[in-house]
Amino acid sequence: MTPKALNSYFADFARAAANYDADAVAGALAVIMAPDATLHMCHPFGDISGAEFQATCLAPLHRAMPDLERRDLIFMAGSTPAVHDTGGQHWIGCCGNYIGTFLAPFLDIPPTGQLAHMRYHEFFRFEEDRIVEMQAIWDIPELMMQAGAWPLAPQLGKFLCTPAPMSGDGLAIEGDGQMALDSVISMLTDLCRFPGDPDPSVMRLEKYWHPRCNWYGPAGIGTGRGISGFRNWHQGPFLRGMPDRKLDAMGDLMSHWLAAGNYVCETGWPNMRLTVTGDGWMGIAPSGREILMRSLDFWRLEEGLIRENWVLVDLLDVYRQLGVDVFARLREFNKARVPGSIPLPDWRNA
């Protein structure tokens, strides 16, 4: 199945969701998504069927943002290579932002009455011309932070609306991606040399990462600039808190990869196993509890080096595994706020 064919199958849904039209989205999903498709959604949605996607996930978001838009920043389509999986599966990977005027509660997150954004990484597996599996993370903590409702530890990295690729070609990716894929796989292999070898130089970060790289992490971790920002605001605390990380192709862990031109993307449900020890992580005490992690990533290389890396981790599910109900804490923190929708005045009377 060619990237062009996958793109054509997906086009009606992408068009209907761009300026969200509920009827058009329903019609497109009826054609493209198998009713019994397995959809692995981030916490709190969990696993649902294809027939439930709109009612369970999209419709509540649309009610919260009546002028909802789904804006792809990166679009990749193709067949998985023989890297840690059998290869030959047909996937689409999308990175983008849902945006709209936040006028009604969403998952008990209080509305702001203003433009809001929520990053998504959505992966769709096709058999013939229908979606049979989806793996997706929505950056729900990003929406909580914009509402002033995030109930947990402050993030170390910077908060921002994640930008599109600097190169401007995220929706028109072409060419053979084998060199980019080989570089990313080698980079991840070298990352895993530490902390077994306690010298950080064994990761050879300068070999793989551009000196002006941007690491776009999820809300709760934040974004870092350059190798120093990557190390200080994400990787250092991450490895101190969970030094025993294990990646895909180990036991029940598995990733699926796409590569084209200067881009690589990966999805796995789950694709990491870790134990929270050492210093703890993100303000979480070191419980010694093993967790499974889902990390859905996109990389863009420039002159053979990683210039941009978009990462979403299902942090709400991480907290769930550690016994922290983020939504219960959110309700406690915000129960003095007036619930319900925000009626914006007519602009003629503003």
Each model region followed by its residue ranges:
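C-terminal and inter-domain tail/linker signature
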Residues: 1-350
